[in-house]
Amino acid sequence: MYFDTIEAAPLMTNCYLIGDEKAKACAVVDPGGSPEKVIAMIERSNMEIKMILLTHGHYDHIGAVDALLEKWPGLPVYIHPADLCPAESTRERYRMPDKGASQRTYGDGDVLELGELRIHVLHTPGHSPGSVVLLVEDVMLAGDTLFAGSCGLWDLPGGDGDALMASLARLGALEGNYKVCPGHGHASLLDREREYNQFMRQAMKQ
């Protein structure tokens, strides 16, 4: 699997590019800002961008979406339906043009195909109602649900601490030692988070 990442302004959001090099097909995850950097990351892959995947609808994860749609009109943009309202509110607040025709939704248990890659969708509410985690091969694209040594905030509009704990417990119960690629900060391993992350440890005891 092809894999690349950049940090995007304004809140140093990790934006990821995943792809199947044989099929020359890629997807961008959480293009939160710095559209010129996101576009450069896509173009240097020498693959065709097929979709935009959003782990949730907060502005620091969707800020470059409309710039990408200006360059690649009609590109599908996937988001969980429970976060459609936050995403649309963000568009209004930041005066982003509406590209609703490109909007798609995905939910728990869905599997997206990207060449030979299979992207598994887990609904992990808590940081936001529609937060998702994406699993592809041995990589966990965790959004703002799980961080290295921590977890996402739940005291934001739409946040729910109990739901977040349930989501962390679900992630902790997964088989395998995924590489955890969070929405902010450095990567980790799921085994390490199970052992040392106090939030995940607490969640798994409940």
Language-model-derived ranges and their functions:
Residues 1-45, 133-143:
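Conserved beta-strand hairpin/beta-sheet module of binuclear metal-dependent hydrolase folds
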Residues 2-4, 48, 76, 104, ...:
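Conserved beta-strand segments of alpha/beta enzyme cores
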Residues 4-7, 19, 107, 113, ...:
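Residue-level detector of conserved, well-ordered beta-strand and adjacent loop positions
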Residues 5, 17, 111-113, 118, ...:
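Residue-level detector of beta-strand face positions
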Residues 26, 33-113, 195-202:
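Active-site HxH/HxHxD metal-binding segment of metal-dependent hydrolases
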Residues 28-29, 50-57, 77-80, 123-126, ...:
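Active-site neighborhood of phospho(di)ester-bond hydrolases with catalytic His/Asp-centered motifs
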Residues 86-92, 96, 118-206:
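Metallo-beta-lactamase
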